[in-house]
UniProtKB/Swiss-Prot annotation:
The gene is mtnA2. Belongs to the eIF-2B alpha/beta/delta subunits family. MtnA subfamily. The keyword Amino-acid biosynthesis applies. Substrate binds at R47, G48, A49, R88, Q194, N245, K246. Catalyzes the interconversion of methylthioribose-1-phosphate (MTR-1-P) into methylthioribulose-1-phosphate (MTRu-1-P). Keywords: Amino-acid biosynthesis, Isomerase, Methionine biosynthesis. The active site is at D235 (proton donor). This is Methylthioribose-1-phosphate isomerase 2. InterPro entries: IF-2B-related (IPR000649), IF-M1Pi (IPR005251), IF_2B-like_C (IPR042529), Initiation_fac_2B_a/b/d (IPR011559), M1Pi_N (IPR027363), NagB/RpiA_transferase-like (IPR037171). It catalyses: 5-(methylsulfanyl)-alpha-D-ribose 1-phosphate = 5-(methylsulfanyl)-D-ribulose 1-phosphate. It comes from Pseudothermotoga lettingae (strain ATCC BAA-301 / DSM 14385 / NBRC 107922 / TMO). The keyword Amino-acid biosynthesis applies.
Length: 345
C-alpha cells in the first residue's frame, strides 16, 4: 500500500510536496522562512484545511528560529502571525493552529531558546495529532459505508489535503483496506481540478477503484450507477452545521438530496467553528479570474470576459446527513449536537 505525506519537518526547514504540478511532476520544495510558507499557502503549493494549519504552525517555528535576542520578539512574531492569517481566509484550521501557537508565544517570559524549542514541539504535536485524528475519523466513518458501496466525492481530502491519510478520502481508504469492495466517482472539481489531478492520483497510488467525472455529471452518475453516499470535506463548519467547502459542493449536495443520496461532511473538530453562527458569516475567498479563463497554459475564454471565481461555497445544514469527526458522527439538529460535541470533550 502506497503512502505519502504532503508535509515533512526537517529541523530548520519545511518540506512540501508541490501540489500544483501533480500528477505530471512530483516536486518537493524546501521552505526556510515564514514568508515562503505564507506564499506557499496563498499559491496553493500546500492546500487542504488541515494541511494549511500544520504548515502555518511550522511557519511560526521558522520565524522564531531566525530571531535573536536583539530582536523585538513579540513584534516579529505578531508580524508573522498576521502574514499567515492573511494567506487564505476561509479554512478555519489555519486560524486554529495559529491560535495554538499564539497561546505559547504571547506573553512568554522564558528564554528565546526555550521558546524556539516549545514552539517547535507544539507544531510537531499538531502534525502528529492530524494523522491520529484522521485515522480515528476513518474508523468512525467506515460504518456508514456498505459493502460494495458506490461513493461520490468532491475535490481532494486525502493525504495531500492533510499530513497523511485524509478525511473523506481517509474513510474511503480505510473502507478499501478492510475489503469493502468500494468504487469511487471523483468530481474533477473545476477550476483547479483537485479531483482529477489529486484525488485520482491518490486513488491510483492506493489501488482504489475509481472513475473521474465532470462536475456536471453528478446527477446522471447518481441515477445511472445507484450511488450509495456522497463524502466531502470541509474548510469551515459553522455552529449551525452550514459547511464551507470547495466550490461545487453545494451543487453536489442539492443533486444528492434530489436523488436521496446521503451526503456526509468529514472533518476534524478543529474545522468546526462555534464562533461563526451560520454559513452567511463565513468569509469566502475569491481567486484569480485566470483560473477560469485558462486551463493550464491555454486560454479558453476571452480575456475581456468578467469572471466570478469563489474558491468555496456554503452547503446549508439541511442538505447534510451527518458530520463525521474523530469524536463520532454528529447528526441533526447540528446547532445543538455540535455544541454537545465540545461540551463532552
Amino acid at each position: 500500500m502506497s503512502t505519502f505525506r504532503s508535509i515533512e519537518w526537517k529541523k530548520d526547514k519545511l518540506v512540501l510536496l508541490d501540489q500544483r504540478y501533480l500528477p505530471e511532476k512530483t516536486l518537493y520544495l524546501e521552505l526556510k522562512t515564514v514568508d515562503e510558507v505564507a506564499r506557499a499557502i496563498k499559491e496553493m503549493t500546500v492546500r487542504g484545511a488541515p494541511a494549511i494549519g500544520v504548515a502555518a504552525a511550522y511557519g511560526m517555528v521558522l520565524c522564531v528560529q531566525k530571531l535573536s535576542k536583539n530582536d523585538d520578539l513579540i513584534r516579529e512574531l505578531q508580524k508573522a502571525d498576521d502574514l499567515l492569517r492573511a494567506s487564505r481566509p476561509t479554512a478555519v484550521n489555519l486560524f486554529w493552529a495559529l491560535d495554538r501557537m499564539k497561546k505559547i508565544w504571547q506573553g512568554f517570559n522564558g528564554s528565546l531558546e526555550d521558546l524556539k524549542m516549545i514552539l517547535e514541539k507544539e507544531a510537531t504535536d499538531i502534525e502528529r495529532e492530524d494523522v491520529e485524528i484522521n485515522k480515528q475519523i476513518a474508523k468512525n466513518g467506515v460504518e456508514l459505508v456498505p459493502f460494495g458501496a458506490k461513493i461520490i466525492h468532491h475535490c481532494n481530502t486525502g493525504s495531500l489535503a492533510t499530513v497523511d491519510y485524509g478525511t473523506a478520502l481517509g474513510v474511503i481508504r480505510y473502507a478499501h483496506e478492510i475489503g469493502k469492495k468500494i468504487h469511487v466517482f471523483l468530481d474533477e472539481t473545476r477550476p483547479r481540478l483537485q479531483g482529477a489531478r489529486l484525488s485520482a492520483w491518490e486513488m491510483k497510488e492506493l489501488g482504489i477503484p475509481h472513475t473521474i467525472i465532470v462536475d456536471g455529471a453528478s446527477g446522471l452518475v447518481m441515477k445511472k450507477f445507484k450511488i450509495d453516499l456522497a463524502l466531502v470535506g470541509a474548510d469551515r463548519i459553522a455552529a449551525n452545521g452550514d459547511t464551507a467547502n470547495k466550490i461545487g459542493t453545494y451543487n453536489l449536495a442539492i443533486v444528492a438530496k434530489y436523488h436521496n443520496v446521503p451526503l456526509y461532511v468529514v472533518a476534524p473538530t478543529s474545522t468546526i467553528d462555534l464562533k461563526t453562527p451560520a454559513g452567511q458569516d463565513i468569509p469566502i475567498e475569491e481567486r484569480s479570474a485566470d483560473e477560469i479563463r485558462c486551463v493550464g497554459n491555454s486560454q479558453v475564454a476571452p480575456q475581456e470576459s468578467p469572471v466570478f471565481n469563489p474558491a468555496f461555497d456554503v452547503t446549508p445544514a439541511e442538505l447534510i446527513s451527518g458530520i463525521i469527526t474523530e469524536k463520532g458522527i454528529v447528526y441533526p439538529p447540528f446547532k445543538e449536537n455540535l455544541r454537545k460535541l465540545f461540551e463532552s470533550a
